[in-house]
Amino acid sequence: MENRKIDGNYVAKADERFMGMITGNVTVKSGVKFINHGMICENVIVEENGFFYNHGMVNGNIMGEGYAEVWGVVKGYLSSMLNTYVHQEAVVNGERYEFDEKSI
């Protein structure tokens, strides 16, 4: 996994673990697993049957009809159309997710 910068939008067409920065939107195609450890400066669109795992930062929204898991930070919102799981200590739209024994 090399650290790199992509200027503009990016389409993930094959499984990938990314470290670095993408200055535009990211589209995760159907059947693809995209694991982000870096920064995405705009939105993430996850197509149906696509998988997005965020350990880094997304400065926009995560939307689409696929699956998303968040460990890191999403400055925007998570679309209600997505199948999502937000892990403890993740931050979405300024809110840190914390779980207590009563919520599990």
Named regions from a protein language model:
Residues 1-104:
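Extended beta-solenoid/beta-helix repeat architectures
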